[in-house]
Amino acid sequence: MDIDQYMTDVGRRARRASREIARASTAAKNAALEAVARAIGRDADALKAANARDVARAKDKGHDAAFVDRLTLSDKALKTMIEGLRQVATLADPIGEMSNLKYRPSGIQVGQMRVPLGVIGIIYESRPNVTIDAAALCLKSGNATILRGGSEALESNTALAKLIGEGLAAAGLSQDAVQVVGTADRAAVGKLITMTEYVDVIVPRGGKSLIERLINEARVPMIKHLDGICHVYVDDRASVAKALAVCDNAKTHRYGTCNTMETLLVARGIAPAVLTPLGRLYREKGVELRVDADARAVLEAAGVGPLVDATDEDWRTEYLAPVLAIKIVDGIDAAIEHINEYGSHHTDAIVTEDHDRAMRFLREVDSASVMVNASTRFADGFEFGLGAEIGISNDKLHARGPVGLEGLTSLKYVVLGHGEGRE
């Protein structure tokens, strides 16, 4: 296969389809989503058979249990796909919304209209459910999509692509509006991320090595996040009860997510009251504690152990595991400075009963999501009321934070006049 020519053809078809899908009615887009949902339910056995072949190959290659679990399309996973498609169909369609309409002294009316981005390339790894999640959000937001999943899920993704195509056709929409790259050749990714004439934005969903490669090689703009080094700062004016609840959930609710707390900062004046019960709780749950000298002194005095001495690298690490770095700081100044120096601009929280300090933290911490008296685990499109998300961005342009339907759109200016000319 000539990968360059193949991907060029995919891009050309996507660009053509993007113009059609951009003007599609809400009813047509929702009908397509419902048709795909029905098709998944109808062909569940065929989907599971295709997926079983992917899973067998993954096991033969020695992939671990966690990888195989992400790859597997269980009955529950298929049900979640169907529910997700129907949920996206219920979301308000942002396309065509008019906002900020104002009359100017010249007599013209100026405002903004929400429009699709165009063609979105999604690059992801072993989760075939992303094929449906991404296709649904891009379709509802009026975008064409090129989906490049991991080679290990090729048969699963191909089977899902067939059903998506059927759903589009049933609604009278171009099947080229959602295309799954039908090759495992890594050169396809290299071509996709450089096709600026056909692709408007890339959304990568994968591990750090994938994101780093795309940062170095992509010519197409990206909506991405590299790391989720999330902090909770417990202020010396915090409620101890709130601090325990927030810090427990932020770390132990799930270890492998990008919005899990990786570093705990505690004000010196409240450290014994907070770290003593927290340290015991974390050790009971099997969390390894990597601590600075001051935190070690407090925890050892409380009989908490074993402890590991933190290094500078620990403050820069996204563990995605039951490991937590702990540092005692002098106060909010030092906490904000530490977060802005070592954090990844993803999600950070303060626990405090002081309103002025809370507002200062919100203003000065340079992250996509900043929270007061709440767990970092809330940094999620569903929890934010977006309905669904395609990912989380810790960049400042174009979207920031959880990216839902609006994050897959742009605003263009519109001018309404009555024959006016500029003087």
UniProtKB/Swiss-Prot annotation:
Cellular localization per UniProt: Cytoplasm
Entry keyword set: Amino-acid biosynthesis, Cytoplasm, NADP, Oxidoreductase, Proline biosynthesis
Major localisation: cytoplasm
Record bears the keyword Cytoplasm: yes
Molecular function GO terms recorded: glutamate-5-semialdehyde dehydrogenase activity; NADP binding
A Pfam match: Aldedh
Reactions it catalyzes: L-glutamate 5-semialdehyde + phosphate + NADP(+) = L-glutamyl 5-phosphate + NADPH + H(+)
Enzyme Commission code(s) on record: 1.2.1.41
Record family assignment: Belongs to the gamma-glutamyl phosphate reductase family.
Protein name: Gamma-glutamyl phosphate reductase
Native organism taxonomy: Bacteria, Pseudomonadati, Pseudomonadota, Betaproteobacteria, Burkholderiales
Gene: proA
